[in-house]
Amino acid sequence: MKPIRCSDHARLQMVLRGATEDEVIVTIRSGKWETAKMGKFRTKHQFNFDKISLTNQKFYKYKTIEPIFADESNEIVVVTVKVYYSNEEVKL
């Protein structure tokens, strides 16, 4: 199993958008990889949240993490992380 490394940009986006490194790792390890732009990959995973979001101070039941990453020969490099908050469960 390849190690997962987050770029500086990905780490900053995780802080700003409310994702943790553990959530990103779980998402990459458990999700179905899809092709993204420029030879990268993406996947999504929905987590129970049941909290107030730090980004807009609203309550949400779910948080979906979407890392964009490169599958290199010796590691997986996370380029950026998108985070979506919702009150509806999504089938991924």
For each predicted feature, which ranges?
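Ribonuclease/tRNase effector modules and their secretory precursors
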Residues: 1-92
